Swiss-Prot record:
Protein name per the record: Eukaryotic initiation factor 4A-13
Binding residues annotated for ATP, in chain numbering: 84-91
Organism per entry: Nicotiana tabacum
One example GO MF annotation: ATP binding
A Gene Ontology biological process term: cytoplasmic translational initiation
Amino acid sequence: MAGLAPEGSQFDARQYDAKMTELLGTEQEEFFTSYDEVYDSFDAMGLQENLLRGIYAYGFEKPSAIQQRGIVPFCKGLDVIQQAQSGTGKTATFCSGVLQQLDYSLVECQALVLAPTRELAQQIEKVMRALGDYLGVKVHACVGGTSVREDQRILQSGVHVVVGTPGRVFDMLRRQSLRPDHIKMFVLDEADEMLSRGFKDQIYDIFQLLPPKIQVGVFSATMPPEALEITRKFMNQPVRILVKRDDVTLEGIKQFYVNVDKEEWKLETLCDLYETLAITQSVIFVNTRRKVDWLTDKMRSRDHTVSATHGDMDQNTRDIIMREFRSGSSRVLITTDLLARGIDVQQVSLVINYD
């Protein structure tokens, strides 16, 4: 459990950073963890029966590597740092830990989860609700672009878990619509992305409004200095789990690398792929919003039907585009990596990292 600690008193960030550097440079180890217990099945984790029902109903059969190591320490109330790439099962890890610890007879917010984007927050809400379907969990997403009054109404009626973006969550706390008195779990998902988007001050402001003894989970693809600073200030002897990037591969997914000597040849190669392969739906990742617009125009000029979404678009437009893509009426989506962290579309058969 963590309170706001004096800098450097709770967590040796330099030791952690040095160990990560050492691990990333070796081929002998796949994981660095300060928690030795590994559970090969969900049944062995001591989870509530109705939580297990939700996990299996959602489609999970066997825990991923990070779930084998990360669910139980979170369920025990320990502070946890988990560093791994998207797609490794981090979301289900902290959702399971939260759902295991809730007091369902108390309809008050007991867990607060922050995410960098509206799309990701809504995706987490969906997973939390699905895994907790047999537990009767009440979850609400507090995100920008939605009605403040509706947020206030739902929060005042009572929820167990709030998932949201830092700006809207802080606003709800400031308005006293979100009462922090019973919050015992605080999760930062995609912490590196939140910090890169300038949410550091809001995260600190939110933490100051929470009870002094609170469990903290930090989940991130990378651990930049700003994220390590958060671990020092907020966390108490956290369990640390790092999965090497090279070891993050998902079963059933084939990965290919196309060596293109010149930047201008990428477009030709991309169009060749779409003319050669039978693709159900696909997502193309690019690094910038400007690149989204450029690639969309280029592909449309070559008679490819594509949709595009990025952070400069208004929220209603983004919602419409995502609904069309999920329904299958749009087959190709061009987007930035950050927005893509909230995308979950079962029919996608091809993912292209353009940059």
